[in-house]
Amino acid sequence: MFYSLSVKNFILIDELEIEFNKGLCVITGETGAGKSILLDAILFCLGYKTSNNIIKRGKDYAVVNIIFSLNEEIKNFLVQNFIEPEELLFVKCLQKAEGRKNFFINNQVVTKALMQQLATYLFELHGQNNNISLLEANTQRDILDSYGNLLDFRAELSKCYQAWQNTRKEMAEITLKQNSIEQEIDYLSFATEELTKLNIQTGEEEKLANLRKDLQNKDKDLQLIKDIIEQINNPEINTSINRAEKLLARQGNNERFEAIVTSLEEAYNNLEEARQELSNLLDSFNYEEYNLEETEERLFLIKAISRKYNVPADALGVFLDKSLEQLSILKNKIANSNELKAQEVLLQKKYYELASNLSAKRLIVAKHLEESLHQELKQLKMAKAIFEIEINTKEPTADGNDDIVFKASTNPGTAAAAINKIASGGELSRFMLALKTALFDKMVKPSIIFDEIDVGISGEVADKVGERLKKLSSVTQVIVITHQPQVAGKADLHIKIEKTQLEKETKVTVKALNLAERQEELARMISGKTITKASLKAAKELLHL
């Protein structure tokens, strides 16, 4: 509900602040006093189109602040739009002389569109030139379903519709992408089979690179051993030693040559031992020569696979896992396509059964609502008005396949047409009041504003309007701009607007009236500028004093 409204430099207003109450709040004032300025200020703040010249003459800016109470629906809206809820809701609009408007929710800058979305959660407006939201097609459907307690049926239908559409969408995607899905399955099947067979481990590339470097160093040692063996296996070495030994043997046991003979024998033995050791080393290198070749082949293969799939070698394992997962998903999509088709048929059948059931209920409820509204309209001096609810079939939606149109005629002999096209502002407001009275505690917004709902009525009819407004105010805050004392007399809060003509400017002031001031204002509304004893007495009676 509206908690307070503050306005500065707005049209004819210098500065004012109003605090609102629960229940019925009426706004009165002489014709031309500027009652519509308050409504303009509210619409300006909440992002709706208003007069272009809203900044008071001589000022650089205009600003309107409104404080609202909160409910869970509004809190959820704020959270969904990343605005931190506070104890109260603070909205603001600032317009500077250059024409730019800035909107704020809880001191956070927001767009005009978001402010307008928020407004739909805060209040309804019904008046001469404004009927916000209630005459939209979806709202008329909500009125009918709320009146007939059909919202649970509609929710079940909506759930079925969403499931049906999701299944259709999934089927369409599979059909559209059938070829590409099959191609991707082929690709992933080959890739996963290849990678599984290779079984490349994390860190394997680095280990193989280090091993290759080590083996390449050993390869150099192998070549050295081969070169040495080639040298010491030279036959001339053995021949030379044998010749030397034979020459010494001819000398007999000559002590002078014994040491030389021993050295030659040792040289021969050492040479044989070196040959054996070199042969053993050579034999041990045969395996490692093979291992180097195998290592290089494995390393080359890993690098080639990494380039092929454009994935780092260490990430090939993760790539394999993801590919297997995606392959499973795609195979399931193909396998489930027939199942989805059967499911789609069942959901479609269920939807039309539920929609048909809901349509039948709506037709019954529509007749009851028409009758209820006719009775209300009689009380509001619109006995000859016609109200009809036309229901036609349309394409399936989450809310059913019914096209619901509220139609009316306010003139005898005139065919009923869409309600917002045939009714005047005052008549339309009374239609809305009749609807609200019929619905009463259903579809209640935190606040409802009626702008001059009582145009063209008086006396008993005005009293009936006041009674219904009072009843409605027991479940929501009702703000009424009125000329009728019968309506104003039922207020919980009475606000008076006055326009004062000064020497150089015109000012508008706003005041919440006490009981004595209310009696005087009601008397003025009854008799005009000249307040009489009779009008004061009548005002006293309206206030039940």
Curated annotation (Swiss-Prot):
Keyword RNA-binding: no
InterPro entries given in the database record: DNA_recomb/repair_RecN (IPR004604), P-loop_NTPase (IPR027417), RecF/RecN/SMC_N (IPR003395)
Ligand binding (ATP): G29, E30, T31, G32, A33, G34, K35, S36
UniProt key word Membrane: no
Organism: Rickettsia conorii (strain ATCC VR-613 / Malish 7)
Gene name per UniProt: recN
Protein name: DNA repair protein RecN
UniProt-listed GO biological process terms: DNA recombination; DNA repair; SOS response
Function: May be involved in recombinational repair of damaged DNA.
Family, similarity comment: Belongs to the RecN family.
Gene Ontology, cellular component aspect: bacterial nucleoid
Keywords (A to Z) from UniProt: ATP-binding, DNA damage, DNA repair, Nucleotide-binding
GO molecular function, one term: ATP binding
CDD domains according to UniProt: ABC_RecN
Matching Pfam families: SMC_N
